[in-house]
C-alpha cells in the first residue's frame, strides 16, 4: 500500500499528497494512525476528513492507505453493544484508554475471540444463493441471528457445512468452488444493502403513544421527522419510541447530542423491560453514542454505520427501528466541513448537497422483500433541532420534502406541560390512507370515523379559542361552549400522556379506541341534554367526567370503564 504525506491541516480536514486511494477509502493519518476517510481528490491531492482529534498533526506526517472504504463489521454479538460513531465498542475503548478515548485506537466492532454455537440450516449438496441463511446463532434469548451468504457473493453448491462452536472468523461452510463462508460480514457503510423489491407500507408501527397511533401513524418501513426547538421533548420522544415500538431490533444513534443525555439513556436501557417479551430492552438494542464533544466528522459515519446495521437485521427478516438524534447536528458537521473545504455555501451556509445527503439516508428506509425470501423493514425517525424552533430553516425544510410523517413539537404545548408536545394541527402523516384498512380490520371498524370526528372537534376548538381570547367563553353560544369542553377532554384525557407513569407511558390500541369512544359518547350525551334544555354548567359538572380522566392511568381499565359509562348514562338521564 502507498504511504503519502500530510501537506495541510485545517481542523478535521487534512490535505495529503502521494496517495493512490479512491473516493471514500479509509486511510490512517499521522504517526498515531488516526482513522480517516478520503472525501475529495484533486490532481495529486487527497482531501481527507479525520474521525478523531487532529491536534498535534503536522505537515510531513505519514498517511497510510488501507485499500478499502469504511466498513461495518456485521455478525453475532453486535446486539446490546454500545459503540462510538465508527463502530468501536465503548466499554473496550474504556478498558484500553480509560474514560477519555485516546487517539489511534483500533477495536473490532464484533468480538473475534468469542465462540458462538452455529446451527446449520442447509445441508451438503444444497444450492445457496446471495442473502440466503446457511445457519443461525442464538444471539439473545429471543433473537436468532441468521448467518447469510454475503449479498455480493455469487453463491453455489454446499461442499461442507459444519455444526458446533466457532468464532466469527472461523469457516462454517465451504462451497464447491472452494470459497469459505464465516459468520462475519463486512459492508461499506455508504452503500445500501440490496433487496429483491420494496413493498408498500401497509402495516402500522405501534408506538403506544395515543397522539401518534391515533392521529399521525408511522408505518413499518416508514420515515418520520421530529422537529422541535430546545426543550420540546425530542430526545424523550425518541427514547419512548425506542422503548415501546413493536419492532424486533432498535438502533439508537445519538449523533452530536449532549453527553449527559446519552449517559441517561445508557443507564436507563439496561433496567427497562420490553412489554412484549418481559426481557431487558437492551437485548434488542444497539446504541451508537457519538456526543457533541466528539470529532464532527464521525457524526456522518455514525448515521451511515447505524443504517448499515439496520439493513443487516432487515435482511434477516426482522422489523427494525432506527432513531437518529439529531440529524441537525450531522448537517452542522457537513456545514463545518464544507466551509473548511472552501465549497460554495448554499442557504444559511449549508452545502448545496445537503438535500441529496438527507435523501440518500432516508431513502434507505422501507419495507422490503429480502434476498433470503420473506419480508423485513427499516423505519427511520430523525430528530431535527432547528435553531429557535424555526421550521423554515433548510434542514427542516429539506427533511420534510423526503419524510412522510411530520410530528411538529410545539414549545407552547411544552410551556403548558402538555407532553408529548406534538401539535395536532401542524403535524401530518401521509401513511393514513394506506393504514386505514388495517385499523378497520384489527382495531375497530369505526376507528377511522372516530379519529376524524375527534380531529374535527380539535380544529373547531382552535377557531373558537381565538374568539375566547377576545370575549371569553361565556359569550359563546352554549353548543360552542360544549365543543370547547369536549376538545379540552380530548386534549387533556387522551392526547396528553406521561412518559414517566408506569401505565400511561404505553397505551395499547384497544385502550386508545375505548377512551376516545368514551369521550365522544360524552359529547353525544351532552348535546342531547342541551337539546332537552339542560344548562351547560350542569352538563359540564357531571361526576363521571372526572372518573373518565383517571382511566388512562389504570392498567386493568375495562371493568372501571364500564362502570363509568353506566354512571354517565344514568347521570345524563337524570339531568332536567
Curated annotation (Swiss-Prot):
GO terms for biological process: proton motive force-driven plasma membrane ATP synthesis. Keywords: ATP synthesis, ATP-binding, Cell membrane, Hydrogen ion transport, Ion transport, Membrane, Nucleotide-binding, Translocase, Transport. It is a peripheral membrane protein. InterPro entries: ATP-synt_VA_C, ATP-synth_a_Xtn, ATP_synth_asu-like_sf, ATPase_a/bsu_AS, ATPase_F1/V1/A1_a/bsu_N, ATPase_F1/V1/A1_a/bsu_N_sf, ATPase_F1/V1/A1_a/bsu_nucl-bd, ATPase_F1/V1_b/a_C. The gene is atpA. One of its GO terms (cellular component) is plasma membrane. This is A-type ATP synthase subunit A. One of its GO terms (molecular function) is ATP binding. ATP binds at residues 228-235. It catalyses: ATP + H2O + 4 H(+)(in) = ADP + phosphate + 5 H(+)(out). It is an enzyme of class 7 (translocase). It comes from Methanothrix thermoacetophila (strain DSM 6194 / JCM 14653 / NBRC 101360 / PT). It is found in: Cell membrane. Component of the A-type ATP synthase that produces ATP from ADP in the presence of a proton gradient across the membrane. The A chain is the catalytic subunit. Belongs to the ATPase alpha/beta chains family. Has multiple subunits with at least A(3), B(3), C, D, E, F, H, I and proteolipid K(x).
